[in-house]
Amino acid sequence: MEIKTSAIVLQTIKYGDSQLIVDFFTEKLGRLSFMVRVPKSSKGKMKRQLFQPLMVLNLEFDYRPKSNLQRLRDVSIQIPFSDIPFSPYKLGISMFLAELLSYATRHEQANGALYLFIQDSIEWLDHAKGAIANFHIVFMIQLSFHFGFMPNIESGMSGDYFDLVDGCFAAHVPSHVHYLNKEDSMRLVSLFRLDYKTMHLYTMSRMERNRCVEVILEYYKLHLPDFPEMKSFAVLQELFA
């Protein structure tokens, strides 16, 4: 079956001297992996540069449902980046988000709303001119909505401790260890009220920001099966001092 779809690059693994295994989140079919042969010369369309983290591409291929690795027939850039490849901060964020999405969408089928959210977020990051230190935090919070486990911050009126397991506030300390103290809980409430346009208004120290990311990643681990440690988090910890 011939398929034409837009797709977002999540992960690229070198396979031999002239092939790549590329994981995509596609608009029409959800998560797919491809074996891509790249030329050693400058000729040909399948250039390695196309398959960088979060690149938004147009794909054309013959879909084989029983195959674990699809084969591309044609590829082109749908959204050319103007700033992400040239900004160390945006590049660091894009690597972090690509790794996050690579784990979070492993079993994801076609999901138009999720795909549109990710694509719009990538475009926003590329065009952003102001402070972006909170971008990945806002992204992770909003992404949790699409996976069905967005925390209930409205329950904050009835308790001081945010329960990471139940995704809501508790009046008393939960019986398990996965909860936040009052200070972290109130910061979480503030962050959940932000969007990309207002995120620059909320200032945090490097330590506070890293703590927020740690908390949200713990929340993901509790609600997404087999969610691993994020290797790229170490890069972000150093970027926004």
Write out the residue ranges for each language-model feature.
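Non-catalytic alpha-helical scaffolds and adjoining flexible linkers that form interface surfaces
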Residues: 1-241
